[in-house]
């Protein structure tokens, strides 16, 4: 008999003959077709091929994943090496900054300029120490044109340093009310008797004395226009302005007895161009004759802030004062 699940298409039915004539039963033999028998192994082989291909693809994917994992591990190692090198560089830089740390009190932008200024000052001091004062040094004074015969054009007498040796050092040249005697030989070719006349306005009060009162606006308060007209027009204009009206006897005393205003007048008459800027400085520091003789280049450069050229000139004039030599402008 054929099972219900079998199909007539897939089997071959054959009749089996019977030897019993009385029996009406018919027997059939069923056999499967050969085509159906061959189909089942083919299906199994196809499935096995598919599984092999899947295994190969899985193996390939796993191999690629392993390669990617190895590459990531190498990258991690390289990044660790780079990090160690960077940290080493940072530690070295921090150590160098700590060893070369600036002193407390110095700013980063002001430490080097201060050091440079110190070196420049040291060089200036060395230059001044090696500087020699030649005897032939003679400062030049600018000569201004004579415009008119106004009282400001009055000539001043030559400044002679030999006169202070004959003077008495006990007498104060500025506080003395009486004028010192006039030496006509010191005046070139003009008569200055009226210029040094003992007027009450000149020596009687402090407002009339030009040296004692530096705020005097002009010398019109002391001299009249008659004195100005008596001056010869051939005389050049004096470089000293309104503060030059002081008696010669007062300025030719010993330098140690000079007052502050006498020192100021000495600066103006000696070299107005170079030394006049020091007038206010000397007045503020109250530099008198004794202090003037004690001044050195180091004091002028460090404490007074004077330039090197001006300090050299002033020290030269102070040395001439100490030697008692005479130089006329």
From Swiss-Prot:
<dbReference type="GO" id="GO:0003682">
    <property type="term" value="F:chromatin binding"/>
</dbReference>
<dbReference type="InterPro" id="IPR001660">
    <property type="entry name" value="SAM"/>
</dbReference>
<feature type="modified residue" description="Phosphoserine">
    <location>
        <position position="138"/>
    </location>
</feature>
<comment type="similarity">
    <text>Belongs to the SCM family.</text>
</comment>
<dbReference type="GO" id="GO:0042393">
    <property type="term" value="F:histone binding"/>
</dbReference>
<dbReference type="InterPro" id="IPR047531">
    <property type="entry name" value="SAM_Scm-like"/>
</dbReference>
<feature type="modified residue" description="Phosphoserine">
    <location>
        <position position="238"/>
    </location>
</feature>
<feature type="region of interest" description="Disordered">
    <location>
        <begin position="138"/>
        <end position="157"/>
    </location>
</feature>
<protein>
    <recommendedName>
        <fullName>Sex comb on midleg-like protein 1</fullName>
    </recommendedName>
</protein>
<dbReference type="GO" id="GO:0005634">
    <property type="term" value="C:nucleus"/>
</dbReference>
<dbReference type="GO" id="GO:0045892">
    <property type="term" value="P:negative regulation of DNA-templated transcription"/>
</dbReference>
<dbReference type="InterPro" id="IPR013761">
    <property type="entry name" value="SAM/pointed_sf"/>
</dbReference>
<keyword id="KW-0805">Transcription regulation</keyword>
<keyword id="KW-0539">Nucleus</keyword>
<keyword id="KW-0804">Transcription</keyword>
<keyword id="KW-0597">Phosphoprotein</keyword>
<dbReference type="Pfam" id="PF00536">
    <property type="entry name" value="SAM_1"/>
</dbReference>
<feature type="domain" description="SAM">
    <location>
        <begin position="258"/>
        <end position="325"/>
    </location>
</feature>
<keyword id="KW-0678">Repressor</keyword>
<comment type="function">
    <text>Putative Polycomb group (PcG) protein. PcG proteins act by forming multiprotein complexes, which are required to maintain the transcriptionally repressive state of homeotic genes throughout development. May be involved in spermatogenesis during sexual maturation.</text>
</comment>
